A protein has these predicted regions:
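Hydrophobic alpha-helical connector segments
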Residues: 4-38, 90-94
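Secondary-structure edge/capping motif, primarily at the C-terminal ends of alpha-helices
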Residues: 9-16, 46-49, 105, 142-145
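Short secondary-structure transition hinges
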Residues: 29-71
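Short acidic/histidine-centered micro-motifs embedded in hydrophobic/aromatic stretches
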Residues: 44-47, 90-93, 97
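A short small-residue
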Residues: 49-53, 86, 116-119
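C-terminal peripheral helix-coil segments that are non-catalytic and often amphipathic
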Residues: 67-74, 78, 82, 97-145
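Membrane-interface starts of transmembrane alpha-helices
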Residues: 80-91
């Protein structure tokens, strides 16, 4: 799932594209929205997957992840002007926001019923818009570091 997500980011945000922060955030949010299954897997990654697979399988998974990060790094540095030492943290921060929002945005009938019984109205969240705003905020933060 990560490879497809990273490939989509790489294709949509080529070096020298000249996109400003708002455009990068909008494009990235659209890609995140199209790859929500990647973020859903992230919801179980640390607690289930990474604790129940062989070291070899985990190493294969991590290799694909870091190859994707390494491929994106020069592009993101070029486009965003974020220092190399901050790129992995930048990507990871966006990832965990996506994981959290996907967990929040999922339609779970049991949760809906429990909240209905408690007469709690949960606010509607727009995953893409929330991701866009968060990515824009992260870009601004990491650019000034």
């Amino acid at each position: 799932k990560f490879q497809a997500y990273a490939d989509a980011l790489s294709a949509a945000l080529p070096e020298g594209c000249g996109f400003n922060t708002e455009v990068v955030a909008e494009v990235w949010a659209g890609i995140a929205n199209a790859h929500r299954d990647y973020f859903r897997y992230g919801d179980i990654l640390n607690s289930i997957v990474e604790t129940n697979v062989s070291v070899e399988k985990l190493a294969d998974f991590k290799r694909v992840y870091y190859e994707g990060v390494n491929k994106l790094t020069p592009q993101l540095i070029s486009i965003l002007g974020i220092k190399e030492e901050h790129i992995e943290k930048f990507i990871t921060t966006i990832y965990y926001q996506g994981v959290g929002l996907c967990g929040w945005c999922q339609n779970n009938p049991l949760v809906h019923e429990a909240l209905k019984q408690l007469q709690i109205k949960r606010p509607e969240l727009d995953f893409k818009a929330e991701m866009r705003d968060f990515i824009s905020m992260c870009i601004a933060w990491y650019q000034q570091k």
